[in-house]
Amino acid sequence: MARSASARDGFAVQWAVKQGLQLAVVSGGKEEPVKWRMEGLGVKEVHLGAADKLAHLTTIAGRMGISLDQVAYMGDDLPDLLALKAVCLSCCPHDAVPEVREAVDWVVPEAGGQGCVRNLLEQAMKLRGLWSSNDGHRW
């Protein structure tokens, strides 16, 4: 099954990495193009085929030197619930399953693959004063 990808999400991901945010992708899917795209955007922690997302997230946070109460996590389906409940800020795209929408702190107005990651990263960077830059937001 092919996943859709947003160029705006991609821009925000690479911009966040350039601004020093630590990003990770933990997916139950095994689609290598997801890994290639994320690595191409600068994400170093890309984990596919993750059956236990909370375990992966905990390991990644440890490697990054942060605790789960410093993590924002976006998920859209039942396998994300434990991870969503363990972090500081839980969010989901508006087309997530009802159980996830009910469990999160923030339902992002965009659908998955249509700018929801951009919205989260843009808000996080604006809060830190990192969204505007003299670099002109270059790729």
Indicate residue ranges for each PLM-predicted region.
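Alpha-helical substrate-recognition element adjacent to the catalytic core
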Residues: 1-55, 139
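Mg2+-dependent phosphoryl-transfer enzymes with acidic/Ser/Thr/Gly-rich catalytic loops
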Residues: 1-6, 45-47, 54-139
